Amino acid sequence: VKNGIVSSITVIEISQDVIDLVSPYYKDLNIKYICSDVMKYKPAKDEKYDTMYFDIWPDICTDNLDDMKRLSYIWRYHKKTADSWIGYWQKDYLLERRKQEKRYETRYY
């Protein structure tokens, strides 16, 4: 936000304790905190973003890819432009792992 390129940040966090812990360190920035489960949060129709990044998973597991697909479906309507970006923590790694799992399944079963 301080660089002039980013005008605001919205954080959706399930834990109010985490918000209370982190927010004082960023009070001078234009950050909006929403205490909610991002998987259940219903954004307003006019809520639009240039960049969305999700890192809600406590561990790295290919099961997370299903959540990523669901989030992409929900949030695609909230992209500010066609070039707006949706990213996920460890997505590329998990996609590669899924390919390896599929190769293993077909080879040994």
Question: What kind of feature is each model-predicted range?
Answer:
Residues 45, 51, 58-109:
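C-terminal substrate-binding/active-site "lid" region of AdoMet-derived donor-dependent transferases
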Residues 8-13:
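Conserved SAM-binding motif I beta-strand of class I
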Residues 36, 55-58:
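Glycine-centered flexibility motif
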Residues 7, 29-31, 84:
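A structural micro-motif
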Residues 14-47, 51:
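S-adenosyl-L-methionine
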